[in-house]
Amino acid sequence: MKVRASVKKICEKCNVIRRRGRVMVICVNPKHKQRQG
C-alpha cells in the first residue's frame, strides 16, 4: 500500500474508489494499491 498525496491509475485495471472518506486505488496488481494520505 502506497500512501501518496495524489493517487492515479497506473494501469487500465486500476479502480479509483472512496472508502470512509479516503480516495483509494485498488487493482489486480498488489503493487498498484494506493491510498491518499
UniProtKB/Swiss-Prot annotation:
It holds the Pfam family Ribosomal_L36. GO terms for molecular function: structural constituent of ribosome. The keyword Acyltransferase does not apply. PROSITE patterns: RIBOSOMAL_L36. Keywords: Ribonucleoprotein, Ribosomal protein. The keyword Transcription regulation does not apply. One of its GO terms (cellular component) is ribonucleoprotein complex. GO terms for biological process: translation. Belongs to the bacterial ribosomal protein bL36 family. This is Large ribosomal subunit protein bL36.
